[in-house]
């Protein structure tokens, strides 16, 4: 993942230069990881990457690393909420448990995300119901 590679590169760099230039020209092709079938890599790789960065970063970045981990847990849970319920139930429950294990860090989140995290941990049925409704009404039936 690009994020992990950038973290390692910048961690080892003695200096860096900012250039306002984007060399990437992403083209999403049929069958790419973005549009392909959902699998365990799609679910757990972003979480693993954030956890690796959190474990490797210094104290001055711990809070930012924790926020990044919490946000990706919220995002992945939301994605699993709109996917096939039966197929991803165990994964959704596992992500919920990972989020619940980080409960003491919820105070780092924005008010909105703190509310979402609490709903996922304390009333997941309510989150799933309201989130699916939100996706149907305001996102045209798709969330990504």
Segments (PLM) and residue ranges:
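Active-site anion-handling motifs in enzyme catalytic cores
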Residues: 55, 71-74, 117-118, 143
